[in-house]
């Protein structure tokens, strides 16, 4: 149902196809959360049913149209589709993204299609995955080629079930702050001093959330080992 012409927050880059898959997944989970609030708090059962009905309709469409059988990674979620068999295979660092779907509660982290998608987006098969001397991660057309968004590295850590992978992500984030002590919007894959937005509250807040999550999960030793 999400057919707006632009992509993520602040991104005026127009879509190539009509339906942005991660945003539609997010719509499904958001509609169900709204229905719960409407039912339990507002006692608006009729409106709540409209939300759950729409969520079910969009979910059915995603199951039918949002996947693609990739020759290397198996069945994955496409980034954009048009419902006529065309798929755009990529991911963008902006959240909602394919990588971030379990973080947002849109899919289970153990969903096999998600795990295939996760491997795809963190590879050279994703045209907006960049790897260089300073670090690696996903960027997007909002900033341009070779610029890694720390947000993507955070989302990899948020959705990881491997402590060593999480440790690598956090170290990379710490090593690419250009000595400023802050997360930036993006940094050049070969030179972290070439960055955009010296102060980007969204990224800084997410980094704090990631550290707090690890502390709450009893992984202080992991953090202390960095």
Question: What is each model feature region?
Answer:
Residues 35, 99-102, 154-155, 208:
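Conserved small-residue packing positions in alpha-helical repeats and bundles
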